[in-house]
A protein has these predicted regions:
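Short beta-strand and adjacent tight-turn residues that come in two discontinuous sequence segments
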Residues: 1, 30, 110
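Acceptor/aglycone-binding surface of glycosyltransferases and processive sugar-polymer synthases
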Residues: 10-90, 117-124, 128-134
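Short beta-strand-to-loop acidic/aromatic patch adjacent to the donor-nucleotide binding site
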Residues: 1-7
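Active-site loop/turn elements of alpha/beta-hydrolase fold enzymes
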Residues: 6, 32, 112
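Generic secondary-structure signature for well-ordered alpha-helical cores
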Residues: 1, 18-21, 139, 143
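Hydrophobic helical membrane-anchoring modules
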Residues: 83-162
Length: 162
């Protein structure tokens, strides 16, 4: 997956695909390296989501939960989408990576340059998407509580996956 908003460096596609081939059962996740074009409001909003993701996974494994540059392991992702109802807008990327992490998949974070073009178009709907994201974080928080014994066991006993 690479968002079509022109923010991500498409020259990194071969590196992401090579990492996915080397680790076919892992999520290859972009870890943005921002330049001076990044709006401060977006950085703050993204950080708030990252904190919730770290709480909801009881880990720091997901370096950036909102990056639109990823390679998903297909079978695990299809299985997840077949059994769970996940968001379809700005909440999709966050919810999918959290749920894949819950299922025991490794998250491999690769640095990638991100720029915000001056003439870029955002499809973010301020109120609607913030409400969706807040509701998603609440659902994930309660999902984490239910899964917390297994998530904590995974942290304490790394051989426990899934």
């Amino acid at each position: 997956q690479i968002d079509a908003d022109g923010q991500h460096d498409a020259d990194d596609v071969p590196r992401f695909l090579a990492e996915a081939q080397a680790h076919p059962d892992a999520v290859i996740n972009g870890r943005p390296l921002y330049d001076e074009s990044v709006p401060m409001g977006r950085l703050i909003g993204r950080y708030a989501t990252h904190v919730w993701v770290w709480i909801n996974t009881l880990s720091l494994d997901i370096a950036d939960s909102m990056c639109g540059f990823r390679v998903y392991p297909l079978a695990a992702t299809i299985a997840l989408l077949d059994r769970e109802r996940v968001g379809l807008r700005m909440d999709f990327d966050v919810e999918v990576i959290v749920r894949l992490h819950w299922s025991g998949l490794e998250i491999r974070n690769l640095p990638t340059r991100v720029t915000y073009p001056l003439d870029g178009v955002s499809h973010f709907q301020l109120w609607r998407d913030n409400v969706r994201i807040s509701m998603m974080h609440a659902r994930l928080f309660f999902g984490m509580l239910w899964r917390s014994p297994r998530l904590l066991a995974r942290r304490l006993l790394p051989a426990v996956r899934g």
